[in-house]
Amino acid sequence: MSEQFIQFPQIDPIIFSLGPISLRWYGLMYLIGFAFAYWLGMKRAKASGGVWNGEQVDQLLYTGFWGVVLGGRVGDVLFYSFDRFLQDPLFLFRIWEGGMSFHGGLIGVIVAMIWVSYRQQRSFWQTADFIAPLIPFGLGMGRIGNFINDELWGRVTDVPWAVLFPSGGYLPRHPSQLYEFLLEGVVLFGILNAFIKKPRPMGSVAGLFLVGYGVFRFVVEYVRDIDPNVNTAADLITRGQLLSLPMIVGGVGVMLWAYRSNKAE
């Protein structure tokens, strides 16, 4: 029966090692995502008519990078592994044993944007609108890293494109990482970068990002395997969906406020 499904490609998560230092596919995917965001950010800065310059983009992306790393790790521990953290506080620092949470990373980036906006004496929403279209590609690369790592796979299914993941018991499962790559990485990137081709009210781009990611993540959670460490309300809604709902509601609220209060930029 397993022959009708797709065998997971056996890929070593470590590309190469030099002594104690190893380069992993997961880390490389994030580096590619960050490099692309840097390139696109510089390109947009040159086209901004002096609103942004290279030094300001450097500061924003550097600070945002640490917001993603620190917020993502703390969020993963608090949202998904809090019981383990209480038993072993040093688990927080062992990133290779747990991973990072998008929602925690988002909180970290928001804190970073508040600080950068203050330093650059500009509106928070101007900063958020600038960085929002840079994010999806990196998210997509992160999901490719999850796929290579044989983690965060989907629920058992009999669809023809089901994948037999080794760590998933070689049961046919939804390749939910690839669904998220397509929706959060490709489709959301296309939507946001098409949206900004015309002048938009301040805050509307950030609001659209929140709605888009929240909706896509909420939908994919229906086929993504439930984290055994997380208890949800009668298994009717996952932790990821609970965390995505405020994004959707908040994003709609931001867009309504933006179109009612601000002029197109």
Swiss-Prot record:
It is an enzyme of class 2 (transferase). The chain crosses the membrane at residues 14-34, 60-80, 95-115, 176-196, 203-223, 236-256. InterPro entries: Lgt. Keywords: Cell inner membrane, Cell membrane, Membrane, Transferase, Transmembrane, Transmembrane helix. GO terms for cellular component: plasma membrane. Pathway: Protein modification; lipoprotein biosynthesis (diacylglyceryl transfer). A 1,2-diacyl-sn-glycero-3-phospho-(1'-sn-glycerol) binds at residue 143. Pfam families: LGT. One of its GO terms (biological process) is lipoprotein biosynthetic process. Its EC number is 2.5.1.145. It is found in: Cell inner membrane. GO terms for molecular function: phosphatidylglycerol-prolipoprotein diacylglyceryl transferase activity. It is a multi-pass membrane protein. Catalyzes the transfer of the diacylglyceryl group from phosphatidylglycerol to the sulfhydryl group of the N-terminal cysteine of a prolipoprotein, the first step in the formation of mature lipoproteins. Belongs to the Lgt family. HAMAP family: Lgt. This is Phosphatidylglycerol--prolipoprotein diacylglyceryl transferase. It comes from Haemophilus ducreyi (strain 35000HP / ATCC 700724).
